Amino acid sequence: ATKTTVTGTGENATGVAVTTRIYKTYEKEWGISCRELFTQFMVRIHEQINGCIIGQFSKLKIPVAPNFASFRRLFRARAGHCFIVPGNTFDNVKGQFPVGFFTWHTDDKRPVGEIVADVFNKNGEFIGTKKLEVEQNVMSINDWIISTRNRIGEKIIGFMSAKGCDFQNQNYNFIINEKSQLPHPRGTLVTDMNLKEIAVYLAVRHSVKKTWLNDRDQFTEPFDTWSHDIEFQNDCLAYTLFSISNNIQSAFGINYWQPFTEADLGITNELPNHFMTDYISGKGRPKAIQ
């Protein structure tokens, strides 16, 4: 999905690479990465031309993209010298993302592991190195937040859009009243039972500035120490309550996110609900997550 498909203002192109013979031959084994034409070239060379050196440039899908997990599991070659440059150094490219130049030595068969690439800026100046690697046996941050769904007795207080696990999808991570506000919602319900995790998720994904170099970096599940760090949890909740990515509006339903009491606001009329102030004080917080 793209910005236009998430918001309902456009459609993605279909059938670009899924009608080829190579796709039909290898898709079942190599997975959805074969929907990319450049992947089909890589797979065919890997399967049919032994001992060659492959030169490849693309976005950083092979070393880090979640959809390329099956590709990384099957592809066997030693990564040679690699370097990364900003994508907008190419003609007619405006996006802020990295493009990698890779060499693969297929005569030295080994799994795709850690790759250390040189990094050059738009002026061709060397600015350092970057490690490209997907941690094995670690859940993505999206799989982690999905695991907080469907807790017994939960009260729904909103919906969090959560497309992708990387910085390029940062703008698609926000909180709204109802998932019906989106034509193609991707995310999870926010409840009184998972608000703590939702706050951590949103704060972590938005508190680090997106750059062209980290654009494809993947967020993974947090270390368990977060669950015992009350100060960190409170900071994340405060960030989430006042973040511009919190788009709760009374026009679309009940606002459970009001963090102030009548006394705080200096008003005499009773507010529609006191969910958030009760939650913050601990009075309305489910015992299972206190």
Where would I find each of the regions flagged by the language model?
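Ordered hydrophobic segments in well-structured contexts
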Residues: H81-I84, P98-T103, N173, A238
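Short, solvent-exposed loop/turn segments at secondary-structure junctions
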Residues: T2-K3, L60-P63, D107-K109
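Mobile active-site "lid"/loop adjacent to the S-adenosyl-L-methionine
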Residues: T2-C34
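Conserved Class I SAM-dependent methyltransferase catalytic core
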Residues: Y26-G87, F102
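A short acidic (Asp/Glu
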Residues: T4-G8, V64-F71, K94-F97
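C-terminal target-recognition/interaction regions appended to catalytic cores
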Residues: Q168-Q290
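Flexible, glycine-/basic-rich loop-and-beta segments that form/coincide
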Residues: Q96-D166
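Class I S-adenosyl-L-methionine
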Residues: R21-K28, I32, D91, Q96, ...
